[in-house]
Amino acid sequence: MSTERDSETTFDEDSQPNDEVVPYSDDETEDELDDQGSAVEPEQNRVNREAEENREPFRKECTWQVKANDRKYHEQPHFMNTKFLCIKESKYANNAIKTYKYNAFTFIPMNLFEQFKRAANLYFLALLILQAVPQISTLAWYTTLVPLLVVLGVTAIKDLVDDVARHKMDKEINNRTCEVIKDGRFKVAKWKEIQVGDVIRLKKNDFVPADILLLSSSEPNSLCYVETAELDGETNLKFKMSLEITDQYLQREDTLATFDGFIECEEPNNRLDKFTGTLFWRNTSFPLDADKILLRGCVIRNTDFCHGLVIFAGADTKIMKNSGKTRFKRTKIDYLMNYMVYTIFVVLILLSAGLAIGHAYWEAQVGNSSWYLYDGEDDTPSYRGFLIFWGYIIVLNTMVPISLYVSVEVIRLGQSHFINWDLQMYYAEKDTPAKARTTTLNEQLGQIHYIFSDKTGTLTQNIMTFKKCCINGQIYGDHRDASQHNHNKIEQVDFSWNTYADGKLAFYDHYLIEQIQSGKEPEVRQFFFLLAVCHTVMVDRTDGQLNYQAASPDEGALVNAARNFGFAFLARTQNTITISELGTERTYNVLAILDFNSDRKRMSIIVRTPEGNIKLYCKGADTVIYERLHRMNPTKQETQDALDIFANETLRTLCLCYKEIEEKEFTEWNKKFMAASVASTNRDEALDKVYEEIEKDLILLGATAIEDKLQDGVPETISKLAKADIKIWVLTGDKKETAENIGFACELLTEDTTICYGEDINSLLHARMENQRNRGGVYAKFAPPVQESFFPPGGNRALIITGSWLNEILLEKKTKRNKILKLKFPRTEEERRMRTQSKRRLEAKKEQRQKNFVDLACECSAVICCRVTPKQKAMVVDLVKRYKKAITLAIGDGANDVNMIKTAHIGVGISGQEGMQAVMSSDYSFAQFRYLQRLLLVHGRWSYIRMCKFLRYFFYKNFAFTLVHFWYSFFNGYSAQTAYEDWFITLYNVLYTSLPVLLMGLLDQDVSDKLSLRFPGLYIVGQRDLLFNYKRFFVSLLHGVLTSMILFFIPLGAYLQTVGQDGEAPSDYQSFAVTIASALVITVNFQIGLDTSYWTFVNAFSIFGSIALYFGIMFDFHSAGIHVLFPSAFQFTGTASNALRQPYIWLTIILAVAVCLLPVVAIRFLSMTIWPSESDKIQKHRKRLKAEEQWQRRQQVFRRGVSTRRSAYAFSHQRGYADLISSGRSIRKKRSPLDAIVADGTAEYRRTGDS
């Protein structure tokens, strides 16, 4: 890469739209380099001189250096980094891991520091300090300290338990042992003693202790089998292999002890599937990639032993690099709740300021002229008002609820357990329960507006069955419609003549077998031979049976189909592949494997036949294959027609083709291929470019059709979610026609749906942009917004758009380098200014076009995006989040869905056939798409209702409690005197009112789960934020204000001129405080009873138990015995017994409670009678509804014959095993069975006439 960057020139993008899809990387992270050179490095000829020449430029990108068996090398001064002041530590981490936060000395200070970083805790700490100032505080210090200690203590105990568990886990892991080369031989050492550069030996079933370079193993060609469940959740075995040179020379202990290889590689990062480096040894350089690295956390399987060199240790390993930087998601209610707390704090400041002004005025008018109020201080009224301001901040501090956040977390934790325990979301077939992987998002499940779903494996089963094929223009398979149930009338094809048949494929077209056996049409045999040879499947034998492991379920189905039709893939080595062709074993030399990726959408293999001919066999999506066909292909149109038929039946298709290659052509191409294979930078891009040169002028053989059935309950689930006003977008890598037909099959699209395509959308967006430009352009930010609709009102519309159209519409075109020449780095101020203005114009235009697209798409009832990459999926989700401010949910099952799952507000992973990456990145997971309706319509809705009720009640009870002080201040000279006993203030939120509201937040439900599913329209209240918003908040505030007025003024009126039974007036302050407190506790607990919709014994016990607990504690605290022990803390001696023995006091309490509650009862009655909600109506008739017959699920059927659409499918978004295969590693016989083996299926019977 040139360093003369100032003179470097590039070309800007073309001004015209380009429909070519941008080749995104599926797994980009923040650790990747932004700018990389595109030049292909020349082929290395493996001699010392060129190795040394290539070593220096390689260091510019690969700066991590490892010397084998040389610990002193890594301790050199230039590898030391300054940690603190003069304390230095090595750049290379040791292998001891530390996941715990605290030790015995740091726990208390660090935990307190972390907790006081939260604003609420810091606020109450400041109040506690203010209470220590006697001139300010009228409250005892413990009124704030006890609640604060409870909150801090609960959190500290939870943190301590978690950290102790981490300590134990770290100790257990760090003390594991393995064998390390020391003093020339292997010795047992603990993991924590391992260092970078050590050579270690691992045995079968051992965990890999660090990221190591595989040097050799007990397997042929040093192949090593590993299980990566701790890394990506996948339990199927993966394959790693060493370099050929290390396999050859590093098998014995003595050679391993003298190994002095030097490695330069990338710095530690979090990319699990990427590694770039070079080994320099024996005067030669060898490129290294991820297939040669064993990562920490893997388990050695089916391999007796292996040797490795430690590259990254401890905190530098990839699994540890991935343990942090988790994206923290917060709910809409979280943000709203925080704003409301800020609002309460502002109200607190204003009330305190007003009362302080009142006190200053009162002091000037009354206090200074009343000799009996003189306290010996000659402070001015304004200064006294200043002190009283802080006094009221303390007295009214309970307006800001200290226990709110702790209570919310407890409720969310309980709701998460309810999801985990729900047996109706348990999938018995795979023993997979639903799992809430986060506890912070439950109520947001009740507010979803848009669902973004993958198709394959999410809506469908991802179990592939070979169904039909088209060979040389002839269609083979079942021609009957799915509605015709006459399978029994046609005999299933008998594959008993084939010794390699697995007996699982159900096929009904006997004519195809006749064609294969007769050999009359050589294209038929060529077709199945291609399926048997063009793949990256791995094979082994178990009990005499062939077991295949494929990179995707599609590929496994195709290889199994070829096996059943007489072309069985038997074995492969570095340079050969062995096929049984109708019982005859033939071995072919493999010259090159052109592997699949999500941008190429195809794979090829180049082989030399035993006769010496060179052939290329290719399979891929029809869109890319047809672009590369030779112009003379007589069956091209017939195959297109067959693809249309397959698409109409929602079958997944791909095309097969081949070409013969001349020896000279291959020799020239192979040189370029070898050069690209050893490139140190941009290796993948270089290989793709070379692949393009050979994959052209192909001859079409035919097409395959694979069935991927819908999961059970998908149409019903989509129907119910649509009735809940949730819009569903399907984002898939499949061909447009396949996705469209699946849309009809799952009833996302109907006969009444008007479908808009990319070209329609483009014209609509262009017209909208013109209108906006005429009104002032994209910069007309201050013009009044004009709400326009893209479509006339009425009608059911859907949008189907491909990834290429999406790029064009959103101005995400691939850069063309043949139009506008510009300087990469402007050298003058004018150039810099012009470039900045150009960027701003383009960005504004892009933003406006994106907004218009989102507005248009959201007017449709359904959206299907086809042929989209993982990055495009995430981009679509982000656009809806950004411009519609709507709550989004993304659901998928594969690694290509991880980006959108992380981008959406809620991510749901389905544990299916494509591993566990989606599940591990998700917030919630389960096994079937149909469980989504229960997650949202039952658990999500319940959680939302419960949280809203909890918050409204919590704010209400705190205002009712606190504002009594406000009213009391008008009668005590605004002196910040409290209206309650100090211990009542301390325990009110902790004991007297905490349990009922917690139980309501955990258990309440307005209607049952069955009725929630039966009436999806109930879900709308969460989408519209009807149960918790600023209006509801101020209603709760007003309710609390009125309650506090009633609770204060009724007892005040009763006490003004009252004589008790003993002839004495009970109008002392302490009796007055007891009366208000008693009425308050009864009122707020009965109020929660009015708010409770679902009664259980636990709810009733908590309400009446809280009231009983209040009276029990009050009588104890007012007893003479406790006053004798703590005279200064308990000063209400005998007050409860003296006051509450007066019938007039009880009458006052009952009157206050009744006046508080009866208006609420009346309003609720009138509201339910005159303006009933949907929930009210269902509750009113719930007995009748419960007695009615439950709705029956409709049988899932595919809707055939909707229209004739051509279909093709995309492979899964991951590479296969081509790198491993071409690196020369034969496959060991002992292997686990194929995970995605083709299941029993029903093939269709179809035969067309001769073309």
From Swiss-Prot:
Residues 43-54 have a biased composition (Basic and acidic residues). Residues 1-54 are annotated as: Disordered. The keyword Glycoprotein does not apply. Changing residue 886 to V: In a breast cancer sample; somatic mutation. Disulfide bonds: none annotated. The keyword ATP-binding applies. It is a multi-pass membrane protein. Component of a P4-ATPase flippase complex which consists of a catalytic alpha subunit ATP8B1 and an accessory beta subunit TMEM30A. The flippase ATP8B1:TMEM30A complex can form an intermediate phosphoenzyme in vitro. Also interacts with beta subunit TMEM30B. This is Phospholipid-transporting ATPase IC. It comes from Homo sapiens (Human). The lineage of its organism: Eukaryota, Metazoa, Chordata, Craniata, Vertebrata. The gene is ATP8B1.
